Amino acid sequence: MNARSILLALCGLILGGWLAYFAVNGGDMAPGLPQTQTSGKAQVGGPFTLTDQTGKRVTEKDFLGRYMLVFFGFTSCPDICPSGLQVMTAALDKLGAKADAVTPVFITIDSARDTPEKLSAYLKSFHPRLVGLTGSESEVAAAIKAYRVYVQKVPDEKTPSNYTFDHAAIFYLMGKDGAFIAPIPHTTDVDELARALSASLS
C-alpha cells in the first residue's frame, strides 16, 4: 500500500471518529455555522489574527509553506490538553527530521486568562517549536468559529474566576496552502499520530 492510500485510509477512520465524537457529545461543531457542505470538502480553518507567546502578532499567512498541526485548549485544562500536547510532542519527536515540515500550534480558548506570558511558561513543558496563540475575546472566538471547534464555558458558581470549559479535543492537520487535510482525535496514540503525519508528508 502506498503512502497516499495509507493517508486516505487513516483519514477515513479519523473522520468517522470525529463525527462520532460530536454526535455523542450532542452539539454542533460550531454554533451559527452552516452544517451542510456543497463542495464535498470540509470547510475548516481560515483567516485569523492572534498573538503568539512572544507577543508577536501573527496571521494564518505566517504559516503558509508549512504543514500545521493545530490543537485548541487552555492552560488551566487539567488533563486532556496536556496529554494531547504530550502526544503531539512525542509524535513529532518520533518523525525526526521529517517533523521540520510541521509547525505545531496551540490556540487557547481562554482569552481572558491565557496571556502570552502564561502561554510561554506553559508551553515550555512541550515541543520546543510549539507556537502558542492567544488574543482578544473576539479574535479567539473568530479562530474557534473558523475551525468549527465545539466550546462551552462551564461557570463555577462559588468562584466565578475558576470557570472551566467543555471543548472538542482534536488535532487539525492543515496543508502547506492552509487548507484542511484531516481531523485527528486526541485519543490517537503517539504511533498513530506519527503514522498519519508521515503519510501526509510523503
Please tell me what each predicted stretch does.
Residues 67, 92-99, 123, 144-151, ...:
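Sec/Tat-exported extracytoplasmic proteins
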